[in-house]
């Protein structure tokens, strides 16, 4: 795992914990790489303690040449000709009365293929909101219809960071629609719901992490560059979703263990699901140490505008994920510790809450990280 992927994946887990704390029994889906990339773009224009807080929270201090590494990563995961579609769409929207430095605008365009759009928050914030939503809609093939709800921006807004991700991948081995049936899914020890359960028998990377008491299954996408990795607890052992212990103990090392799976015959039962989650990340990032960025008196974004009176009003991220028989649409290693298995086909029945991530295998980056409590 390279410096940047370690930094990004560690940040992904820390952000995942804060998102789950604020919504302990709900679904979660976000794109950590997309958020890291967007914040790196802000970091490029940050100075002083604002830059130091971003660097520490994003673990940039452990990696060199951050911006050129992000440039390479973006090119790698979004390259044309791949059998999947992945678009990281980041854009800053700034109040038009501010002067933004031409060299900063040129840098974010060159390094992050991003730009800064000037809008009239001061006199026409509702028009600005609609313009932002229209742009996001276009970037995500209309999957994300309304990133900014009414009231998210107003006449006091100075600068917002918009972050949208669109991904579409097809399974290497598709589920057959005729095998999909109604089946129970346990939301907790006492509550169940009926879901559309897909079925597939195939030879797939599988393992077991004893510390977490969970099975791990890797489902490759066409081309092999991306995989969905599912972490399924043996059972619901707590009084909520059954995920409490896994979430507490999920570390960078445990993520790396998920790279050491063994191919075996598996009977997979996986629910079809569709999720859409939106986050204003200010408070979550504040919990992780990014505070000055959102303060009108403390923020130092003088590398963006040349002045000290600019700060970020909102950082908004929205992800959409749909898993079906064909594949996924989203918007948004320690040898020996994963135990392989047996000669009979392994049953992998996803009939209770689980975690998943979508990994870019060549770089080991976690592109999406999610929790499904109710498919």
Swiss-Prot record:
Its main location: cytoplasm. InterPro entries: Serpin_CS (IPR023795), Serpin_dom (IPR023796), Serpin_fam (IPR000215), Serpin_sf (IPR036186), Serpin_sf_1 (IPR042178), Serpin_sf_2 (IPR042185). The record marks 343-344 as: Reactive bond. GO terms for biological process: negative regulation of interleukin-1 beta production. Expressed in heart. One of its GO terms (molecular function) is peptidase inhibitor activity. Pfam families: Serpin. SMART domains: SERPIN. PANTHER family: LEUKOCYTE ELASTASE INHIBITOR, SERINE PROTEASE INHIBITOR, SERPIN. Belongs to the serpin family. Ov-serpin subfamily. This is Leukocyte elastase inhibitor C. It comes from Mus musculus (Mouse).
């Amino acid at each position: 795992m390279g410096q940047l992927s370690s930094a990004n994946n560690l940040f992904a887990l820390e952000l995942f914990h804060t998102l789950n704390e604020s919504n302990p029994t709900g679904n979660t889906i976000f794109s950590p790489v997309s958020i890291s990339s967007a914040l790196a773009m802000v970091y490029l224009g940050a100075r002083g303690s604002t830059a130091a807080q971003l660097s520490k929270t994003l673990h940039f201090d452990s990696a060199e040449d951050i911006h050129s590494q992000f440039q390479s990563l973006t090119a790698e995961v979004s390259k044309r000709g791949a059998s999947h579609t992945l678009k990281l769409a980041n854009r800053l929207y700034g109040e038009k009365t501010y002067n933004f430095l031409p060299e900063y605008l040129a840098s974010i365009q060159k390094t992050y293929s991003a730009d800064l759009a000037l809008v009239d928050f001061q006199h026409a914030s509702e028009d600005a909101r609609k313009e932002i939503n229209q742009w996001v809609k276009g970037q995500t093939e209309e999957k994300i219809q309304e990133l900014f709800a009414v009231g998210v921006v107003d006449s006091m807004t100075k600068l917002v960071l918009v972050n949208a991700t669109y991904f579409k991948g097809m399974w290497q081995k598709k589920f057959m629609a005729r095998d999909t049936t109604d089946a129970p899914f346990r939301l907790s020890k006492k509550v169940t719901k009926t879901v559309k359960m897909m079925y597939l028998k195939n030879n797939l990377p599988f393992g077991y992490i004893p510390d977490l008491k969970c099975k791990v299954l890797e489902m490759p996408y066409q081309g092999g560059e991306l995989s969905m990795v599912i972490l399924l607890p043996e059972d619901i052992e707590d009084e909520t979703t059954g995920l409490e212990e896994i979430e507490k103990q999920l570390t960078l090392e445990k993520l790396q263990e998920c790279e050491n799976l063994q191919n075996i015959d598996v009977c997979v039962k996986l629910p079809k699901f569709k999720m859409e989650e939106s986050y204003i990340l200010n408070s979550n990032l504040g919990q992780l140490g990014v505070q000055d960025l959102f303060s009108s008196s403390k923020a130092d974004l003088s590398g963006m505008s040349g002045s000290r009176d600019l700060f970020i009003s909102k950082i908004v991220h929205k992800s959409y994920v749909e898993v079906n028989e064909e594949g996924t649409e989203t918007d948004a290693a320690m040898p020996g510790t994963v135990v392989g298995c047996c000669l009979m086909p392994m049953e992998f029945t996803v009939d209770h809450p689980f975690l998943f991530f979508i990994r870019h295998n060549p770089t080991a980056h976690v592109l999406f990280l999610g929790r499904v409590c109710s498919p």
